[in-house]
Amino acid sequence: MYKQTVVIFLLCFFICVSCYEVPPAKLEAIWPKGLRVSLPDDGYSLFAFHGKLNEEMEGLEAGHWSRDITKSKGGRWTFNDKQAKLKIGDKIYFWTYVIKEGLGYRQDNGEWTVTGYVDEAGNPVAPTSQPDAVVTEPPAAITPATAIVTNPPTSQNTYPCEISVSMVSVPGFVCKGQLLFEDNFNKGIDKGNIWTTENMFPGEPDYPFNVYLYDNVHVRDGKLIITPTTLESKYGEDYVRQQLDLTQRCTGTIGTADCTRVASGPIILPPVITSKINTKNRFSFKYGRVEVRARMPTGDWLIPEILLEPRDRIYGIHSYASGLLRVACVKGNVEYSKTLYGGPILCDSEPYRNVNLKQKIGFDHWNKDFHNYTLEWRPDGISLFVDGEKYGDVTPPTDGFYGDAKKENVQAASQWLKGTSMAPLDDYFYISIGLDVGGVHEFPDSSTKPWQNKATKAMLNFWNNRDQWFPTWFKDTSSLQVDYVRVYAL
């Protein structure tokens, strides 16, 4: 079957006249024999049906029926099996798949029971006997007499699955355990399709010492790879003292420091190039389980960013007022690389910045190999796992995060009272993956750090000390490498 590198799976949508919907498949038992499965044409380029009769599907197996339909007819995408011999009480287990505007949408765990028949035109019929091919009796609860007068259901009164508390950024409902998002990075990143590649200067609140460009992210051997390089390696020696204008392709706010920087005196251009990608424009969700298999980078002052970021920032746009969720982070310095941490950040600075983060000390350096990092985000808390082992829980107090934050003079705390006890972590978030360098909050000041966080010359001092940190960066080990990203409904 046609395979997409990136798929967003959403199923069983409500009818909504003002918004996009993916309709449920319509199944019909044809008298005296036949099965018809159809969807209304909504701009699809492919419709696939996979099903089994009276036997549950094993995951995404092909099934007894396995067919790709590449053309619609009469305004519908239709699969027909004119030889199928169905009886009242038969149950069909199925899943369907459509491609619309280059994106794949799958309807999982479908179940449909034969309660009546229609003719080829779709008109209900009331046969006086079961089809000739029926060789087994109907279930005890359904007799031929009652089956004859049973009308096909005219509306869907129950959900076809147990509903999840997870929500996605399109109308509809989500089933428990449903795979909502997956990218195995088997193909290159299509800019603007699922992932948006940042092209901008990152700024507050952490002010990292890098610029995000398209150049430093690519896919190789089924892995997403984000590599740090110096600005001089692209633009020439001493370019940190020049001007860099990204306006033409900038993904930040045009006319601001997001898109244009001019060096002046001790204020230099960010001396390192990295990359960052996100799903903000295509996929966001509320509550779920995020799984990322990744290898963290090795090298001084490197910070891998595997995050969930707030889509609408309804509680404020500054100082992480609307929250940030770290799926996992291992800093690149040798002295830090045995420490894994993850969880929520609700303030840009201490003492409240890291209070809710959970840590796990490894027997070895986490960046020596790939690991599975998981964050489970629920309406009542957060759990963190590595390679299937839980290493931390974050549960809001009875008054939410507000009480503790207020004690630490977090300005945004009062805004959280507008939400649930999980506020500000109770709205839609999107996935972002990137690599940062240095900055003014991630590393505490020390005698071995070449800059002071509050110093005006912080970035310049970092750059002037490059003979110390740059030799710790290697092409094969200083990149953030991601094998896959998956999001499941709770």
Curated annotation (Swiss-Prot):
A GO biological-process term: innate immune response
Compartment(s) where it occurs, according to its Swiss-Prot or TrEMBL record: Secreted
Function: Plays a role in the recognition of invading microorganisms activating the phenoloxidase cascade. Binds specifically to beta-1,3-glucan. Binds the Aspergillus niger cell wall component alpha-1,3-glucan, a fungal pathogen-associated molecular pattern (PAMP) that activates the host immune response.
Domain CBM39: start-end pairs: 20-119
Residue ranges occupied by any GH16 domain in the UniProt entry: 152-490
Protein name: Beta-1,3-glucan-binding protein 1
UniProt-annotated glycosylation sites, renumbered to this chain: 372
Annotated keywords: Glycoprotein, Immunity, Innate immunity, Secreted, Signal
Top-level taxon of origin: Eukaryota
Tissue and organ expression note: Hemolymph.
Lineage: Eukaryota, Metazoa, Ecdysozoa, Arthropoda, Hexapoda
GO cellular component, one term: extracellular region
Family listed: Belongs to the insect beta-1,3-glucan binding protein family.
Record gene name: bgrp1
Subunit-level organization: Monomer.
GO molecular function: carbohydrate binding; hydrolase activity, hydrolyzing O-glycosyl compounds
Cross-referenced InterPro entries: BGBP_N (IPR031756), BGBP_N_sf (IPR043030), ConA-like_dom_sf (IPR013320), GH16 (IPR000757), GH16_GRP_C (IPR035806), Glycosyl_Hydrlase_16 (IPR050546)
Signal peptide: 1-19
Pfam families tied to this protein: CBM39, Glyco_hydro_16
Organism per entry: Galleria mellonella
Chief subcellular location: secreted
